[in-house]
Amino acid sequence: MPKLGMQSIRRRQLIDATLEAINEVGMHDATIAQIARRAGVSTGIISHYFRDKNGLLEATMRDITSQLRDAVLNRLHALPQGSAELRLQAIVGGNFDETQVSSAAMKAWLAFWASSMHQPMLYRLQQVSSRRLLSNLVSEFRRELPRQQAQEAGYGLAALIDGLWLRAALSGKALDKPLAHSLTRHFITQHLPTD
């Protein structure tokens, strides 16, 4: 009989092991055997919890996207009466949270983005994440701008966030957070009306 609470512990171990494997060898070369070995479990445990490698990869993607959602929401909840500018900066901060810019997370995101073009479930997850970012940004810009301008500003800031993140991921270096925050803050202030 399985121990109570073991399922969540095992799932976490396997997701963490998957991120480590992707970080070291890439998604396509990360095998079930390697992941199981890193997690200290048998390959049968992966089949038990996730069916197969695709199920494990999907769970890993869901985990990363939920960490992103939580990073953004935690910052927004801390600013319930905050200005649009502060709340936009909070959304940016969530996207540049350590859970999203660690080497393992960046490599996993790149692998998932590439795979999402060919795997419908990963595509849906990627689309949900992209739409959520754009919706959050437009909603905050909408507090200060007409609809069309808010949509354009939201799209531009989303592109800037993704571009800064992608340049860092492809450089193999850590994201320069002060620079990223400075550039996004400048974009935000350029697009919001001045009093």
Curated annotation (Swiss-Prot):
Domain called HTH tetR-type: residue spans:
8-68
The free-text function statement in the UniProt record for this protein reads:
Repressor involved in the biosynthesis of the osmoprotectant glycine betaine. It represses transcription of the choline transporter BetT and the genes of BetAB involved in the synthesis of glycine betaine.
| Pathway of action | Amine and polyamine biosynthesis; betaine biosynthesis via choline pathway [regulation]
Q: What protein name does the entry list?
A: HTH-type transcriptional regulator BetI
User: In which organism is this protein found?
Assistant: Escherichia coli O45:K1 (strain S88 / ExPEC)
Q: Which gene encodes it?
A: betI
Q: Mention one GO biological process in which this protein takes part, according to its record.
A: glycine betaine biosynthetic process from choline
One annotated GO molecular function is: transcription cis-regulatory region binding
Task: Tell me any Pfam family this protein matches.
Answer: TetR_C_6
Q: Which UniProt keywords apply?
A: DNA-binding, Repressor, Transcription, Transcription regulation
Q: Which domain of life is it from?
A: Bacteria
Provide the residue ranges listed under DNA-binding region in this record.
Answer: 31-50
Q: Which InterPro entries match?
A: BetI_C (IPR039538), DNA-bd_HTH_TetR-type_CS (IPR023772), Homeodomain-like_sf (IPR009057), HTH-type_TetR-like_transc_reg (IPR050109), HTH_TetR (IPR001647), Tet_transcr_reg_TetR-rel_C_sf (IPR036271), Tscrpt_rep_BetI (IPR017757)
Cited Gene3D superfamilies: Tetracycline Repressor, domain 2
